[in-house]
From Swiss-Prot:
Originating species: Solanum tuberosum (Potato)
Gene symbol of the encoding locus: HMG2
Enzyme class: oxidoreductase
Name used for this protein in its record: 3-hydroxy-3-methylglutaryl-coenzyme A reductase 2
Annotated CDD domains: HMG-CoA_reductase_classI
UniProt-listed GO biological process terms: coenzyme A metabolic process; isoprenoid biosynthetic process; sterol biosynthetic process
Pathway(s) per entry: Metabolic intermediate biosynthesis; (R)-mevalonate biosynthesis; (R)-mevalonate from acetyl-CoA: step 3/3
Function: Catalyzes the synthesis of mevalonate. The specific precursor of all isoprenoid compounds present in plants.
PANTHER family given in the database record: 3-HYDROXY-3-METHYLGLUTARYL-COENZYME A REDUCTASE
Mode of membrane association: Multi-pass membrane protein
Domain of life: Eukaryota
GO molecular function: hydroxymethylglutaryl-CoA reductase (NADPH) activity
Length: 595
């Protein structure tokens, strides 16, 4: 092999070139050397000279460390908690962190830059190989040598193929791309897909909630590779949910709304809106409404009205926890606490405080009226005011959480079943023998026996908590979704016991539902949305009642209970008559799935 060392600099012949010939131009690296291009040091990016910057951070590190150590010794002597810091201590901590980061990440920058700026003495470097290959692929003859040499065929140098990435065990979905309406939108979409821009900031960037929802939907399609074509986007006022109902929307879900009724309740007729995807539910409830109407209507009474919130506090001993329990249960002290609580709202009024102790932990269940609002935010604000007041009276009290699950919210709990939460309601009706036979297609005795063995004995065998009914949750959920209530509160709102008894010498049927914790409101949350507001308006309970605050929410609770009464009556009759399977096969079976 002929190995020859290349000269440090290319030597160009001094011979005069032809008219059509150009001398071989020096490589760009050589041009930079000829032009005496200055090399940039890494320390040039610093605002101060390197030695001053290093000295500054050295001084800051040791001075701040000395300050913090002295403050630490003082806190130990004074028994001050270490986590309590002043503004000067906070600034010292930040300065210490900054100096440590600099010393670990940037110290010795002058030493490092010597390697960065050190060049190769040989002007021919590795990058010159590409230059040689390009210049050596000339197609014309080398006439400058004074002889005619046949031109060699030009060599075709194919670029190397980039390395293929290793196969992943999980195949990523191919992005589903829909053309954006403008180049600016396309740029924003790509930024979100690549993780350079957060999706939740689209509203701030665009200034339009609807446009942000449209772009966010397109982003989700590209990231997941799944089509969202069936999820509607147009036809919804997204400004109405901004900051209160839903974050980062990409559309809305359509749920059909049916009407059951008229429901004759306390002498008034109500057309009950029910949002559901379960076939036969509206039809069954409608049949129950018909039976109640034909029998003279139903009567409904609100027994209690009070939303609850139960914070958890802890003391050093159980004795101290008991002292606070006696304090808040004292009628004289309660008046003071009620005044503190009531300052948080025009409608929130503290009714009572129920306490429970677990060791040195105290749970205080605040009960208050909340007007026409469901009231969770209202009662939480009032409880916070009381806790701030008690903190001054009991400085050793440690607030664990404003909610200690003794409330109890969105969970089946015996405290709600026994003490009630929200609106406690009982609804009753007497269904005549004729209606039982002609409308419900069953017998009074059969209904009474079925209710005892199914709703009472059967639920007891199952260990049910508040579930002594046939399907109260079905009706509660449907009315809740239609009227903008919190669907998650269907859990405790569906607590119900259904009672049936033969009256009037066994000819007629007395049926009742007792529901101790219906949590509803006619203002706030989803009640202000257009569709839900229309359903509330249909019932005559839209918004707040200015003349009698809270009456609209209580009326809505009675409508819920009356609808449950109708649903229980119809379903129990269908089971008693053996019609349940046939009716569900007719109304609750998808023809597409069965075909």
């Amino acid at each position: 092999m002929d190995v020859r060392r290349r000269s440090e600099k290319p030597v160009y012949p001094s011979k005069v070139f032809g008219a059509d010939e150009k001398p071989l131009k020096p490589h760009n690296n050589q041009q930079q050397e000829d032009n005496n291009t200055l090399l940039i040091d890494a320390s040039d990016a610093l605002p101060l000279p390197l030695y001053l910057t290093n000295g500054l951070f050295f001084t800051m590190f040791f001075s701040v460390m000395y300050f913090l150590l002295s403050r630490w010794r003082e806190k130990i002597r004074n028994s001050t908690p270490l986590h309590v810091v002043t503004l000067s201590e906070l600034g010292a901590i930040v300065s210490l962190i900054a100096s440590v980061i600099y010393l670990l990440g940037f110290f010795g920058i002058g030493f490092v830059q010597t390697f960065v700026s050190r060049g190769n003495n040989d002007s021919w470097d590795e990058n010159d190989e590409e230059f040689l290959l390009k210049e050596d692929s000339r197609c014309g003859p080398a006439t400058t040598l004074g002889c005619a040499i046949p031109a060699p065929p030009a060599r075709q140098i194919s670029p190397m193929a980039p390395p293929q990435p290793a196969m992943s065990m999980v195949e990523k979905p191919s992005p589903l791309i829909t053309p954006a309406s403008s180049e600016e939108d396309e740029e924003i979409i790509n930024s979100v897909v690549q993780g350079k821009f957060p999706s939740y900031s689209l509203v701030i960037q665009l200034g339009d909630v609807s446009a942000a929802a449209s772009l966010r939907k397109e982003v989700m399609q590209r990231i997941t590779g799944k089509s969202l074509e069936g999820l509607p986007l147009e036809g919804f006022t997204y400004e109405s949910i901004l900051g209160q109902c839903c974050e980062m929307p990409i559309g809305y879900v359509q749920i059909p709304v049916g009407i059951a009724g008229p429901l004759l309740l306390n002498g008034k007729e109500f057309s009950v809106p029910m949002a559901t995807t379960e076939g036969c539910l509206v039809a069954s409830t409608n049949r129950g409404c018909k039976a109640i109407y034909a029998s003279g209507g139903a009567t409904c009474i609100v027994l209690r009205d009070g939303m609850t919130r139960a914070p958890c506090v802890r003391f050093g001993t159980a004795k101290r926890a008991a002292e606070l329990k006696f304090f808040v249960e004292d009628p004289i002290k309660f008046e003071t606490l009620a005044n503190v609580f009531n300052q948080s709202s025009r409608f929130g009024r503290l009714q009572r405080i129920q306490c429970a102790i677990a060791g040195k932990n105290l749970y205080m269940r605040f009960v208050c009226s909340t007007g026409d609002a469901m009231g969770m935010n209202m009662v939480s604000k009032g409880v916070q005011n009381v806790l701030d007041y008690l903190q001054n009276e009991y400085p050793d009290m440690d607030v664990i959480g404003i909610s200690g699950n003794f409330c109890s919210d969105k969970k089946p709990a015996a405290v709600n079943w026994i003490e009630g939460r929200g609106k406690s309601v009982v609804c009753e009706a007497i269904i005549t023998e004729e209606v039982v036979k002609k409308v419900l297609k069953t017998e009074v005795a059969a209904l009474v026996e079925l209710n005892m063995l199914k709703n009472l004995t059967g639920s007891a065998m199952a260990g049910a908590l508040g579930g002594f009914n046939a399907h109260a949750s079905n009706i509660v959920s449907a009315v809740f979704i239609a009227t903008g209530q919190d669907p998650a509160q269907n859990i405790e709102s569906s607590h119900c016991i259904t009672m049936m008894e033969a009256v009037n010498d066994g000819k007629d049927l007395h049926i009742s539902v007792t529901m101790p914790s219906i949590e509803v409101g006619t203002v706030g949350g989803g009640t202000q949305l257009a569709s839900q507001s229309a359903c509330l308006n249909l019932l005559g309970v839209k918004g707040a009642n200015r003349e009698a605050p809270g009456s609209n929410a209580r009326l809505l609770a009675t409508v819920v209970a009356g609808s449950v009464l109708a649903g229980e009556l119809s379903l129990m009759s269908a089971i008693s008559a053996g019609q349940l399977v046939n009716s569900h096969m007719k109304y609750n079976r998808s023809t597409k799935a069965s075909s």
